[in-house]
Amino acid sequence: MKKLNLFFYGFLFLFVISCNKSEDVQTTTTDPLMPEMKQRAFMGELTSTTCGICGSSGYNNFNLMKKNNSGKIIAIAFHCNFPDDSMDCFSLRYSYESSRDGGSGIPQFFIGDNYLSYNSLQPSIDSILKRSPEAQLKFTAKRSGNDMNITSKIKFFKNISGEYYISFYACENNINGGSTAGTGYKQSSGASDYKHNNVVRASQVLNNAYGEKFSTATTFKVNQLISYNCKITLNPKWNYNNIFVTAVIWKKNPVTTAPCQYVFVNGWDTQVYK
């Protein structure tokens, strides 16, 4: 009986060891920068502190689209009318709107590549989200002093050709635009506690809202991965606690006379809108 017990416990011990080894073999490491095959939409707004509609219905519409599409949308706001609006990043804003076919007034809303009225915003977002993604990216952004250092990977999901660009934007939230705001920040027709959000402050490429080519190649294969690293220089006057980074992949329009010279492909960030 004792020999039988010893045999049983010995077998049990080997079984446990064998199970543990099996678990070790199954352990894998996931790349934190591996892009997901997920399509997101893009909303770009042109706005200003000097615009009453921007501070009322424009503000409400922008926030509603963010909230209703949280986790599905890249949302940025370019301010204009410098020097009356102190948040006008003139060169970036000008490069953005000069390659878009927009209207004559503000606010202006662009979903993907199209300038749209409010009633068309959600249907256009829904349409983009149904696309089969060409490519996607993922990144980390870590601040060191006045530099935001970015490490990213771009992944293609189709065999495709073209000139692809990438933009990283440093945006700021919770900028006081209410009754106690300073010159150039107080929002016309805004509430006493008004906050400017998603304000584009800078990008990794000076004076170009569409960034730069992340590869010299013009043909890409399914599952091809490309690494891209860069930095954005921040202004010490900004509140670094409220800065976040968002990114967009663009494709250069081969038709040089087209009103939209950079076509939205996809984008990524970690923002959650409530």
Give the role of each language-model region.
Residues 7-8, 53, 61, 118, ...:
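A broad, structure-centric signal for solvent-exposed, well-ordered loop/edge residues
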Residues 1-6, 11-42:
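Bacterial Sec-dependent N-terminal signal peptides
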Residues 16, 48-51, 227:
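Mature extracytoplasmic/luminal segments of secretory-pathway proteins
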Residues 71-274:
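Short, conserved sequence motifs used for protein processing/export or organelle targeting and
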Residues 20, 52-55, 90:
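Secreted/luminal cysteine- and crosslink-motif detector
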Residues 32-78:
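Local sequence-structure signature of Cys/Sec-based thiol-disulfide redox active-site neighborhoods
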Residues 26, 56-60, 148-151:
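Short amphipathic alpha-helical surface micro-motifs
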